[in-house]
Amino acid sequence: MLFLIPSGVRLAWGKPVGPPEVAWKAMTAQQKRTYMKAAVTPTMKPIFQAFDPKKFKTFNCVTCHGRDGADRKFKMPSNDIHPLPNTPAAFEAKLKSEPTWPKWTEFMSQKVEPAMGKLLDLPVFDPRKPVEGAFGCANCHKLEAAAP
């Protein structure tokens, strides 16, 4: 059973159109917006709030897409999420030198990446077995420029 709601997004059995029925890349901007509000935000908000209730007391589009998200048509990676080192060696160095990095890395790799991979119907990035199109750090974070 299909319904047409005012926003123009088709619903099947009351569920917004989205992965895996329609690939994220094939969705219209309106379908993506509806899916983000109906599926992604309600799934990710409690995950982030369980990790740090104070930091993520407010969880909305700006949390991940940044203050300029609307101006950028919500394209990722975000300008407001800190960039990550662009090599495994540089990342390992940060893990050793930055006290909060191990807990954030564990949270992102164990909670955020798997949840987003499932929501977008994408494999999760595994550095031991890279797969093209996998969901990983660079989907949300910019990578630092390579050192000269």
Residue ranges and their predicted role:
Residues 11-148:
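Sequence context surrounding c-type heme c attachment/ligation sites in exported
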Residues 1, 9-12:
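Cleavable N-terminal signal peptides
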